[in-house]
Amino acid sequence: MNIKRIFFTVIFFSFSLIAMAQKADHPMPVTLAIGQSAPDFKLKGTDGKIYSLNSFSKAKALVIIFSANHCPTAQAYEDRIVALTGKYKAMGVAVVSISSNSTPAISLSELGYTDLGDSYQDMIIRYRDKKFNFPYLYDSDDQKTALAYGPVATPHAYVFDAAKKLQYSGRIDASEKPGTGNGEDLSNAIDAVLSGKSPNPATTKVFGCSMKWSWKKELTEQQLNKWAAMPVSINNITEQGVKELVHNNSKKLRLINIWATWCGPCTMEFADFITIDRMYQKRDFEFVSISTDKPEKKEKALEFLKEQQAANKNFIYSDSDIYKLIEAVDPKWQGALPYTLLLEPGGKIVYSQQGPINPLRIKKMIVGHQMIGRYY
């Protein structure tokens, strides 16, 4: 083996070892033990204020709950946390919720039970939508607070006494489905602390969504690469085909967008439809696009769809009379592009929009529909 080959072999293995070390080199969170002091923090709330442990210095009991916008289990407990906060506020109990997931580590494929991600801006929307009566704090992507407390899943509740010593760590209650539990485990722990007693049990296991630690972003990148590699196609569709599409003989909620490459608003908003499709495609949902470009412009339409990585069902209207398309889609449609429909099986129109959509509104409609839902 010559010297040059030896040199490059050594370099190759050196970089390989570095890469392996970087993959394995991440903090291993350990759950805070009973009796330990609450780690301090300095976090921004959805109300714009900065909170630290000292912000709750007068609390007779401090409840810290690690939660997440996107998590079905966490969402199932939101109303219970609001009710629990209202019940104990007058007793000197402070309740705080912290969102600690790393947003780059959350794939769109994990957002099938929500209208929102876990970013700070999305937290503000959830805080307002649900009228949270407790501070909702953002741990940011460095996750320092979560690493200090070591939550197992979301939601994970911690109860500290007046001296900020941990007395309880675990679940809120044993019944995830809304309406089947009232936060019994957490309430019992708070009652015990207020009475100067030790909660029994002091710890429980925690069922919920795994924490999205920053080192998990590799999985998100793998999913993005998988989507990018999926084939994109566009097929001709006639007036009759459009009628059948709108009638929706499937067992899925169907979102249809009518667009064209020459329509500025259409091409500007198309990425939002891809996001929506990737969020809900594992649920009883499908996204379909229909191009109104001339049939001879089919390749141009396909080129655009490939740029968008639109691996959903795509069609181009192949009949000559565009007005028949308009009537086939929706007699109420006046003809301006873009046009969007959300259809139940059987063709009932849940939502229609002439002009650009509001993506958040569409997501709320989808996840709020009885066929989809926010909970398992």
Where are these regions (language model features)?
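Bacterial Sec-dependent N-terminal signal peptides
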Residues: M1-D25
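N-terminal, post-signal-peptide region of Sec/Tat-exported proteins
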Residues: K42-A90
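Short pre-active-site segment immediately N-terminal to redox-active cysteine/selenocysteine motifs
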Residues: K60-L62, S67-H70, K252-R254, W259-W262, ...
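Short, internal strand/loop/helix patches
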Residues: D115-V159, Q167, L302-L337
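Thiol-/selenol-based redox modules, centered on thioredoxin-like
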Residues: D161-I234, L337-Y376
